[in-house]
Amino acid sequence: MSWLIQNRIGNTLLRLNPSSSSIAIFSTFIKNLSTASEQLPETLDEYSQSEEIWNVIVGRDGDRDSEDDVFKRLSSDEICKRVNLSDGLVHKLLHRFRDDWRSALGILKWAESCKGHKHSSDAYDMAVDILGKAKKWDRMKEFVERMRGDKLVTLNTVAKIMRRFAGAGEWEEAVGIFDRLGEFGLEKNTESMNLLLDTLCKEKRVEQARVVLLQLKSHITPNAHTFNIFIHGWCKANRVEEALWTIQEMKGHGFRPCVISYTTIIRCYCQQFEFIKVYEMLSEMEANGSPPNSITYTTIMSSLNAQKEFEEALRVATRMKRSGCKPDSLFYNCLIHTLARAGRLEEAERVFRVEMPELGVSINTSTYNSMIAMYCHHDEEDKAIELLKEMESSNLCNPDVHTYQPLLRSCFKRGDVVEVGKLLKEMVTKHHLSLDESTYTFLIQRLCRANMCEWAYCLFEEMISQDITPRHRTCLLLLEEVKKKNMHESAERIEHIMKTVKLTAPVK
């Protein structure tokens, strides 16, 4: 944990003056939340510098309405003058300000003014992407021309530009960038054509992509991947009939549809709950010499699970085993989850303890997570803890944040906040794990419900410091709770964050 965050949380505790019993509980929450980072001094140093610069830009009064304002702030600040600037630090800063193009450009301008620093192509690519996201097309084009002069434009750059144009509905501009590939020292070939087509299809511009293909295929030969791009594009647009037509077109060009082609269509049928057509497609795959693989069957099972059709999902698993398809860890993780939700705990245990080892299928973190979640869901927390200890002592894999989420949920369910603190401390001090957005959100919401918004607020501060954007609903809940306790400074801070940081939109 950076000294800035430690001081911020420490000052918060002094202002709040909580009870000694609450401090005992909370000390297991926040203390050493970033211990994992402290094992790597160079990472901590870079992180601390990023935090300092962030506070120079956002945490102080004054204008920052333009990149020049940000540049002046950074150039005149004594802390920034002592910063050990690196490509990694610039990347981290640009990532933090990816939704604030003025600050991002101000950072680039300041970095460029620092002695001995020269921007990497990655920094330029990020700037182009940030400007494209903000639809600042003229500024983006300026950067592209600058990159062209320095011969820094790559296919990755082109992909970012085309994606932003296509996403904004400016698909002609995206095609125009492709037409200029020669100016950037890049070649128009099947690879670059597929990049354009894939960009258009992913942005649901599949019809425009079709027009482009018809124009280009006379001098650029499509390959099997070209047709798979369109199959995915049509399915994403929920137009499965066109995807099926593309399968026929693919055959007409001498390419045999592969398991990826069919599985993409099956996934679309699953999303439409057309499971009869799913089974028809499975039969067609077998007849055409492209038998379903483990991913195909797992996709179907996951979709059935989402519909709570657990018994039907188990029948799909049986069909897979009978077909001779070799199962993998992903399939077994899904099978364990299915058995757990169907209430067949003993069968899930047999799969985990007997079937997977016998077939030589590796047990990974997700496998353990499925078993731990199963035990927690069925209120068998002792078995979940035993399995966690087994996982820790094995050489197979290590726990991750998702390992602990069902355990934390169980603790809150029975009102054991002290155990929550112990688990959190174990996560960060023993396994050097960093909390993710979903875990922070879960903890903040549950602490608010438990009338412990002081500690929820401190986790909120830590969340912001880790570059994790809180959800709009989380901010509103926390703001309401701190106002109830007359935590005026905390309320002002939350409101400031809500104004200056682009929050995840509320669920409608």
Swiss-Prot record:
Q: Which organism is it from?
A: Arabidopsis thaliana (Mouse-ear cress)
**A GO term from the CC aspect:** mitochondrion
- NCBIfam families for this protein: PPR (TIGR00756)
Decide whether keyword Metal-binding is in the record. no
Q: Which PROSITE patterns match?
A: PPR (PS51375)
The alphabetical list of record keywords is:
Mitochondrion, Repeat, Transit peptide
Q: Which Gene3D superfamilies match?
A: Tetratricopeptide repeat domain
The entry assigns this protein to a family as follows: Belongs to the PPR family. P subfamily.
Where's it mainly located? Answer: mitochondrion
Q: Provide the residue intervals of the PPR repeats.
A: 120-150, 154-188, 189-219, 223-257, 258-292, 293-327, 328-363, 364-398, 400-434, 436-470
UniProt superkingdom: Eukaryota
What's the name of the protein?
Pentatricopeptide repeat-containing protein At3g04130, mitochondrial
